[in-house]
From Swiss-Prot:
This is Nuclear transport factor 2. Pfam families: NTF2. GO terms for biological process: nucleocytoplasmic transport; protein transport. CDD domains: NTF2. It comes from Candida albicans (Yeast). Keywords: Cytoplasm, Protein transport, Transport. InterPro entries: NTF2, NTF2-like_dom_sf, NTF2_dom, Nuclear_transport_factor_2_euk. Facilitates protein transport into the nucleus. Could be part of a multicomponent system of cytosolic factors that assemble at the pore complex during nuclear import. Its main location: cytoplasm.
Amino acid sequence: MSVDFNAVATEFCNFYYNQFDSDRSQLGNLYRNESMLTFETSQLQGARDIVEKLASLPFQKVAHRISTLDAQPASANGDILVMVTGELLIDEEQNAQRYSQVFHLIPDNGSYYVFNDIFRLNYS
């Protein structure tokens, strides 16, 4: 049976950003020990270190607004590559910050986990 990679990517991103915005300390189940996050210039490996980094970000409230979401199959094994652009509203700031994020999703017992995650704010 063929996987609708666009639907999986959209569902994953909606879940990920809703969880991030409500309680990012609970994102650990989406990562594994071999997962890697590049957040701006910091590189971290492993679910524990990744969640520790995300939970320690210096803001209380955040809201992600997705502008674009593109997905492609990334291997014959069902991996999915996802590219997201959007805006972040942080704490009480009125001006949103633009961001880009890439996820490499790996199938895992009927679900997916994040193997690679690259996040970058876009300043311009």
